[in-house]
């Protein structure tokens, strides 16, 4: 493949443009640099920036059918061979479990043995690990190593997020054992996060598996083996997601049962109270009619005797309920 002039890929508003130095480090791209398989370039763009969008639309270095994909139209994880290059779309979780489940960030990559062009709109936090390694001189040395390290970082972030969700589910299960019900909508949000993760991580695992089996010229056998390990690790994460989804279904049934039991207990308590006080209510209503005068109204102990009668009546009803094992 022909070498590329640095001036042809030096986009002014790029997030960064680096030359891999083959020793695990990078140096800033200049117009005088020559980009080839021995000195590959990583160009990272925000496709919403004007000059980056203009470069993506006009550069002859990219195939025509790649431009739209790099400009944000491709969202589902996939991998496509495009002549001498490869187009890869990946997803990464960026934040904590408090975010909405659709906060998965897309990153699109077109690469060959000379050039890596990656685009995004929102920042991909997983790339910070790769960038840090390159700045410290312990990063990837070539395009194949770069792709493996990026996929490894994305999988690490996904695994951490899945682990956080798993811990939340364990806490919910422990709380349910103590009859503590989560806030309204909490379990639904947790379940949706799991489902969205499952939706995008399953095809991403397939992307990793295909990259490990494709005979890409810029990947060696060791890098393919590492990519297969990453695919297997993400597959175990997907198994954990499936288990968590099933557990949230069980918890939803358990929450419904706890709420039903609480409602039944309250209804039962109110019914018992009504049964205890029903006779006394009848007597007070009967004596309060006052059509022929209140019985015992002229006797000074009449009210006291009536109160004693009510207490005895309530006690008798309560004793009957207790012996009947209702109370």
Swiss-Prot record:
Q: Primary place of residence?
A: membrane
Name a GO CC annotation attached to this entry.
Answer: plasma membrane
Subcellular localization, per the record?
Answer: Cell inner membrane
Residues in the Periplasmic compartment per record: 295-300
Keyword terms of this UniProt record: Cell inner membrane, Cell membrane, Ion transport, Membrane, Transmembrane, Transmembrane helix, Transport, Zinc
Q: Does the keyword Calcium apply?
A: no
Gene3D superfamilies per the UniProt record, alphabetical: CorA soluble domain-like, Magnesium transport protein CorA, transmembrane region
Please give the start and end residues of each transmembrane region. Answer: 274-294, 301-321
Family the entry assigns: Belongs to the CorA metal ion transporter (MIT) (TC 1.A.35) family.
What is the protein named?
A: Zinc transport protein ZntB
**Organism, scientific name:** Escherichia fergusonii (strain ATCC 35469 / DSM 13698 / CCUG 18766 / IAM 14443 / JCM 21226 / LMG 7866 / NBRC 102419 / NCTC 12128 / CDC 0568-73)
The job of this chain, per UniProt, is described as: Zinc transporter. Acts as a Zn(2+):proton symporter, which likely mediates zinc ion uptake.
Reaction catalysed by this chain? Zn(2+)(out) + H(+)(out) = Zn(2+)(in) + H(+)(in)
Q: Does the keyword Transmembrane helix apply?
A: yes
Which GO terms fall under molecular function for this chain's record?
cobalt ion binding; cobalt ion transmembrane transporter activity; magnesium ion binding; magnesium ion transmembrane transporter activity; zinc ion transmembrane transporter activity
- For side Cytoplasmic, which residue ranges? 1-273, 322-327
